Amino acid sequence: MTSPTPTRRISSSSHATIKPALKVAILLLLAFSVLVALGPGPSDLAGASPDPDPAPGAAVGAAAGDGYSCNPLGTATCALPWPSNFATHADGVSPTGLRLNVSDALFSPELNAHLPGASRPSAIYDGTSGFSPMGPIMFEVPAALDRESIQARDSVVVFNARTGERVAIQAQHDALAYDDEVSTNVVKVWPRVTFQWGERYVAIITDGLKQTDGQPVPHEMKLVNALFGDPNAPLTKWARARQAEVAKAGIDPARIRQMTDFTVRDQAETAAPIKGIIDEIWSGDVPIRINAVHDLHGVAEMDYAIEGEMLTWQLRAPGGVMDLNRREPLWLKFDLMVPTAARHRQVPVYISGHSLTLDRNQARASWGSLATEGFAVIAIDQPHHGSRVREDLGDLTSFQATERFPWLISAGGQSLVDHLRLLRAVETTVSQIDRTGPSGTSDGKPDMDGSRTSYEGVSLGAVVGMPFVFAAPTLDAAITTVGAAGWIYSVANSMLVEVIHADKIANSAVNGSEAALLIGTAQHASDVVDVPAFADMIRRARADSGRQLRLLLNHSWGDQVVYWYGGERASVLAGVPYVGPGAPPAGSIITKTTGDASGGWAATGYRDAYGDWMGPTLNGLMPHVSFVNPGIAKIVGEFRHRFVSENW
């Protein structure tokens, strides 16, 4: 797993007084000069980058045999930098022309010993057409970093190799690597939105990234050696081609310290499993069982409540591994409230997604207000919550060992399929319930209209619920508050990661770099059930009615519980305009658009109204509770009311 990084010895004499770092910089400039002299002329170079080997990993042997485990330009942890097209081989039927070929030796024996086979690298990566559109990219550096320099615009650069366009990124000193028992220095890079499907990217660390002593991070000597290697050698060809692409993108190649390139997997291939599940679910009815009915006597305009169960599929094999082909029956408890409005008309149905540590009973707090607006309300428990804790072998605070790694990954996918089946149950079986009418008793007509459905998720319900909002083919409206696009991203970036012990998932890693790599692998495994896979579905009109989803996304700037970058990512992927209140803060990737939040497609953002005087913990926590902000409550209420009065 780990090996010392070899360095190239450059002989010196009593006359040589040039500092090593300066010497390397000069050599890199010379190498680039030779590349330009022997290759295309400057005008040609400006118009087209060298045609790269479509599968450089196969060419250098990194992905041969049992698969990739070590980057030929690797650092002390030789799998890094990651991701890398060195882990690919050519495939004529792949939509990207590539397939990943990764060995379980990407992880140390110590880490693999705590993972089931289906959660090891080969099972997660092999055969996919590229890497995650969410990243993250990881570089390891040998010395402690100046944290502020990571935020500099030119310290870490990622650009599209085809267009040269730079990508908005979130570069960070990885907390897992820093806090690990055997700490390392890892720079982790997430896209602020996504890396585009099917595109190839080049990522570099430059001399803008500083160590704590103020000096630039050193050159990776394996890269220097490759640049000065045999010009016919595959690795040298790769290094020089990437160097030329860096120059074409407007960056001085002499500034490069480390470098990787990678191709993003294909969207259609990634989304296919869930799209197949959607077709399967919508091909029939979803059974329910009614266990108890409670007469609410019209209090707060509520007619009756039902405790019941819905049949879903347990997609988690023993050990928690997600298997989207699994169809083990699983009955989930639900609570349903039907308002008195159902005595006179079929009422729309509101699906409620609860917050972290709560359960389906959270919806009961809004029964009264939603009943007055004429909504029926239904809710189920999220994985690891409420009635599901025993089945899932613990709540979200139970992730205290690497053995729980599969459960963390599969929680998002299980929630997605559960809610797709709940929506279909509302359309086919729940909506057929008839227990009230003009006289307060059944009248032979269904009480609910299953074709008019809304979803509202708050906090956890707006994170694991976000893929459902994007993928659900017949949902009419959705409201999310302090949510995000990216389940693993949100876990990795939450200030609560230690509170729910998600950091202990990586306890069996041999060092901090491997711990970071494990979380990156979790993201790749989650792609098939994550928001980006369904970004092309959210604006599609319903086949049955032609209606489009109406969407309101509320996020809170400064939120460190559900990190606010994830909220902005969801807004951009959904293509919704930001309508206020106020102007976005510095660092935002969205701009304010004139409009009305109740117009159907909107994102709102709130700043922390409490100031910065409370200290880092409360400053990160208080923006998250913005869902109790009267301003947000007013916008949500207006948005919801207009759907009842104007659209339905």
Regions found by a protein language model. Name each.
Residues 25-37:
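Bacterial N-terminal signal peptides
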Residues 37-51:
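Signal peptide processing junction and immediate N-terminal pro/mature segment
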Residues 51-293, 299-313:
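Acidic, low-complexity Ser/Thr/Gly/Pro-rich repeat segments typical of extracellular/periplasmic
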Residues 292-343:
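N-terminal cap/lid segment of alpha/beta-hydrolase-fold proteins
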Residues 319-331, 343-438:
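Cap/lid segment of the alpha/beta-hydrolase catalytic domain
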Residues 411-414, 473, 477-648:
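C-terminal subdomain of alpha/beta-hydrolase-fold enzymes, centered on the catalytic histidine
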Residues 440-492:
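Primarily recognizes the serine-hydrolase "nucleophile elbow" in alpha/beta-hydrolase
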